[in-house]
């Protein structure tokens, strides 16, 4: 992993300059690993060993003195398709890498490709409960959503399960979000991490003009109403899109990280921002080369000044840094 140190140090120097003497909430994000490698086998002739990049995430968390780490889903269950025993091996490696992090908790927001063949209930819940044992996380029993309070920095971090039902968010989860957002202590801010971007601009080209799911619209309206009434949401962080996006909608900051998935030219909307090159593992030019680089975003929130920043580690470097108010 030493070859990635230069990327971490480059981002850290930019973060340090922005941070100055201010206290802030810090968390590195990784998403859409879509790993094709199980043990030492190559599946479907695609050598795509991205799970090990969680170790880069862990190194970044330690270097930045992070408050937690976030994985926004789609780690590689069914793209390419795997047999049940391979999925179990893949999950074991996922947990092993995350468990080795010196920074806890690890907030995992399951993606649409994580729910194949019941993988989420079978492995995810138990695995991350063990990893985060002892952390002050509030989550309904047997659910894959909840929140983590960082009391010293007055920040509540929600992690959501946006593929819980056919309607994306169950009524129970929606009620949980609403009640615990509006009941935050005075002066606190909220951060949300989840797999899917709920904005239209986060969708692929063929979905751009389809109606948005009702619960996406409903959730955005909840966020916007909270902000209109004086509440503070630092940002909504997601993956899934496979391209970079930053959008302020009705006073709410949305950030989508490109991650490792890749997107073909015909599927990328005109506004999509991409760090890309020819990728030998995929034999196409729609992703960066994960054998030579990495793609991790480090988010930082100055809760005392209502400022947010995102610093790119790896592909694209400072080109994809963002600073904004909330």
Question: Where do the PLM segments sit?
Answer:
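N-terminal active-site segment of His-dependent metallophosphoesterases
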Residues: 1-85
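Extended active-site neighborhood of metal-dependent phosphoesterases/phosphodiesterases
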Residues: 3-19, 80-184, 218, 222-224, ...
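Active-site-proximal beta-strand elements of phosphoester/diester hydrolases
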Residues: 24-40, 154-164, 193-195, 252-259, ...
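Active-site glycine-centered loops adjacent to acidic/histidine catalytic or metal-binding residues
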Residues: 32, 73-74, 111-112, 195, ...
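Short, solvent-exposed loop/turn elements at domain surfaces
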Residues: 35-41, 166-169, 263-266, 318-321
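Surface-exposed cleft-lining segments at the edges of enzyme active sites
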Residues: 36-44, 75-82, 158-168, 203-210
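Active-site-proximal segments of metal-dependent phosphoesterases and phosphodiesterases across multiple
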Residues: 42, 87, 170, 174, ...
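Acidic, His/Gly-rich catalytic cores of divalent-metal-dependent hydrolytic chemistry
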Residues: 303-326
């Amino acid at each position: 992993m030493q070859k990635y140190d230069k990327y971490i140090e480059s981002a850290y120097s930019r973060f340090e300059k922005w941070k100055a003497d201010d206290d802030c909430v810090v968390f590195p994000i990784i998403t859409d690993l879509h790993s094709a490698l199980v043990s030492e086998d190559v599946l479907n002739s695609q050598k795509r060993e991205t799970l090990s990049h969680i170790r880069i995430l862990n190194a970044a968390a330690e270097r930045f003195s992070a408050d937690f780490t976030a994985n926004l889903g789609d780690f590689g269950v069914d793209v390419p398709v795997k047999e049940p025993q391979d999925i179990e091996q893949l999950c074991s490696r996922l947990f092993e890498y995350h468990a080795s992090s010196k920074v806890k908790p690890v907030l995992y927001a399951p993606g649409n490709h994580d729910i194949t063949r019941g993988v989420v209930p079978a492995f995810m819940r138990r695995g991350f409960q063990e990893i985060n044992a002892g952390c002050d996380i509030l989550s309904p029993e047997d659910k894959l959503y909840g929140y983590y309070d960082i009391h010293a920095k007055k920040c509540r971090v929600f992690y959501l399960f946006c593929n819980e039902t056919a309607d994306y968010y169950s009524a129970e989860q929606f009620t949980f979000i609403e009640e615990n957002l509006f009941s935050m202590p005075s002066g606190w801010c909220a951060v949300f991490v989840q797999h899917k971007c709920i904005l239209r601009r986060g969708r692929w080209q063929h979905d751009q003009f389809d109606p948005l799911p009702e619960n996406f619209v409903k959730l955005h309206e909840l966020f916007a109403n909270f902000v209109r009434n004086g509440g503070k949401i630092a940002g909504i962080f997601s993956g899934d899109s496979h391209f970079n996006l930053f959008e302020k909608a009705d006073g709410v900051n949305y950030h989508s990280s490109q991650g490792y998935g890749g997107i073909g030219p015909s599927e990328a909307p005109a506004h999509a921002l991409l760090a890309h090159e020819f990728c030998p593992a995929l034999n196409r030019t729609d992703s960066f080369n994960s054998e030579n680089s990495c793609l991790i975003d480090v988010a930082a929130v100055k809760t005392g000044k209502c400022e947010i920043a995102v610093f790119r580690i790896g592909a694209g470097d400072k080109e994809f840094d963002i600073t904004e108010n909330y």
